[in-house]
Amino acid sequence: MHWVKILGVALGAAALLGLGIILGHFAIPKATSPLTSSTSDSQDLDLAILDSVMGQLDASRIRENLRELSKEPHVATSPRDEALVQLLLGRWKDTATGLDSAKTYEYRVLLSFPNAEQPNSVEVVGPNGTTFHSFQPFEKNLTGEQAGPNVLQPYAAYAPPGTPKGLLVYANQGSEEDFKELETQGINLEGTIALTRYGGVGRGAKAINAAKHGVVGVLVYTDPGDINDGKSLPNETFPNSWRLPPSGVERGSYYEYFGDPLTPYLPAHPSSFRLDPHNTSGFPPIPTQPIGFEDARDLLCNLTGTSAPAFWQGALGCEYKLGPGFEPNGSFPAGSEVKVSVHNRLELRTSSNVLGIIQGAVEPDRYVIYGNHRDSWVHGAVDPSSGTAVLLEISRVLGTLLKKGTWRPRRSIIFASWGAEEFGLIGSTEFTEEFLSKLQERTVAYINVDISVFSNATLRAQGTPPVQSVIFSATKEISAPGSSGLSIYDNWIRYTNRTSPVYGLVPSLGTLGAGSDYAAFVHFLGITSMDLAYTYDRSKTSARIYPTYHTAFDTFDYVEKFLDPGFSSHQAVARTAGSVLLRLSDSLFLPLNVSDYSETLQSFLQAAQEALGTQLEKQNISLGPLVTAVANFKAAAASLGEHILTLQKSSPDPLQVRMVNDQLMLLERAFLNPRAFPEERHYSHVLWAPNTASVDTFPGLANAYAKAQEINSGSEAWAEVQRQLSIVVTALEGAAATLVPVADL
């Protein structure tokens, strides 16, 4: 046992050394030491400071931030985007309200833009080559803000150039199952153009699926049944309501992965190795173009052929048919085809992240990162500027306290404004690739506030299970907007809730996919993360997102008139995010409850037993080791929780606090296995990787099982099921091991 004693001494020495580590690459100038005579190793959350911050977060300042941020289009790397870089630097270097330091990090990344001299187009062409109808290349200028040289034409970023022409078919949401259904209906898809609607699968997946079946071009539109509760008339839509107008077109990246396409797993520095852009995976294989539902109606309501299935029908005021081609007595001559002309260009551009830093007084080498992306497709008042407006207000209030000398956090706070998010989470991913080791070793948590306000009904929170407790604690102390007198927590539970076997009725915490800048932090680095926003009442609308998402109608006036007239919901998000930020950066013991993972694991286990268990037994694959691993994790998490409670009742020395906090911080990393999903770029988290199966359980196991169930699957497929089961069991055992006393194995 002598080696155990040596290990214990080494761990203690390492922890002592850790208390003295500074931020290194993210350090503030040495002349402005953060340490004061009042600094104590036992520094804890100061409730008076917390109350002061809550009181100073100002809705009117958030409003003015948003007006400034969204007054011009600011697509990534544009002159206005770079002007906002300087705005952020100026705010964070302000002598009265700024932070300790601020700087930019630049990356040379591959972006995709439409050709201003040769706009993309969609036409109906007759059998003799005559163009009978050309669809509008831009959205209608309804408020004077939808036109001008800086308003990008609607396009599918990273779709390849080309001018395919063919008979039109309707392919619903463009899933693999949708294209198989068309073939089941006897439709030959070879050489056709597919009209699809947003939803169901990712943007890029629609084109990838289409190409597999011989389709040569894809159109994508937003159906009013999916976004407008079926409303589509001009007097029912923007600018007369919050609904998407008929000419509105959702832009977006059609790249399948995240990060710079040419430098996967490497930061996109000028000197970095780059892939050949012509042989890079993840791009749409065929020309693709989004259109408005006004244009989609002209196409879809003139299609011939069999009626589409009931669940493929939408709200364009006609019966949707499958095609191919148009009705002979419709608006277009018999035999007419659709021509899709895409002239997108790939360009290497320099994109900037902006980081503002407050160095911690006690544990400067422990980071709480708060991030939001800066770039938009057009004005981006909601996405992302509502989040940037909140970020700037939180940093102003904390910066003011910092400059007055009345407060400095226990741990370091890093504010991040990410670049080029809309093209595939590029800025945040490049940052994690550049500082992978440092961030994995030192980051406590990542807070993401992308869109801060979808609407003004209730909080929507997503995150990994350990953040549930800190979000609940914060929201119980903050009043919800309006006159209800409820806390944000009590208002939230009215709209979305679940019954926990441990806590009873609680608000529902959603899971994190890969839809915003938390993706690389969760899936690549294994960092505890969350995403916070205010949203709408889903009992009153079925909209899949706020209706003007990624269009030229997402403007300041849209926010002020329809989403949050008094900006009280923006203020509520600022208070929630600010409270969570302070609790994570200032609390002596990290307010992360690892036992909340036990509920998730038990739920996954139960789903696997019920849906997969019988068939697995037939293949001589036992879930017994998984049952044991889940039980061991639950026991270890509960034991650590009891240990923390005991320490909180005493006067623990700094080493004890540091060791426990490191266990809480590092738990998420234990779920990483970079070889678990070799086909999935950047996905290493065995609990939160993409689950394409219908069973809500461990994703690798669910996906492998679904594939093994396919016709003609052989022993190799079931071997992969066994491998994925072993990966999960090993991860859970490793996670449990991180929670036991640090000198034990």
From Swiss-Prot:
Cofactor: how and how many bound: Binds 2 Zn(2+) ions per subunit.
Binding site for Zn(2+) 2: D383, E422, H550
Transmembrane segments: 7-28
Originating gene: Naaladl1
Residues that coordinate or bind Zn(2+) 1: H373, D383, D450
Pfam families: PA, Peptidase_M28, TFR_dimer
GO MF assignments: aminopeptidase activity; calcium ion binding; metallopeptidase activity; protein homodimerization activity; zinc ion binding
Quaternary structure and interacting proteins, as annotated: Homodimer.
Taxonomic placement: Eukaryota, Metazoa, Chordata, Craniata, Vertebrata
Keyword Iron: no
Annotated glycosylation sites: N128, N141, N235, N279, N302, N329, N456, N497, N593, N620
Cofactor: Zn(2+)
The protein, known as: Aminopeptidase NAALADL1
PTM remark: N-glycosylated.
InterPro entries: PA_dom_sf, PA_domain, Peptidase_M28, Peptidase_M28B, TFR-like_dimer_dom, TFR-like_dimer_dom_sf
UniProt family annotation: Belongs to the peptidase M28 family. M28B subfamily.
Binding sites annotated in the UniProt record for Ca(2+): T263, L266, E430, E433
Taxonomy, superkingdom: Eukaryota
Active-site positions on this chain: E421
Membrane topology term: Single-pass type II membrane protein
Keyword Ligase: no
Entry EC number(s): 3.4.11.-
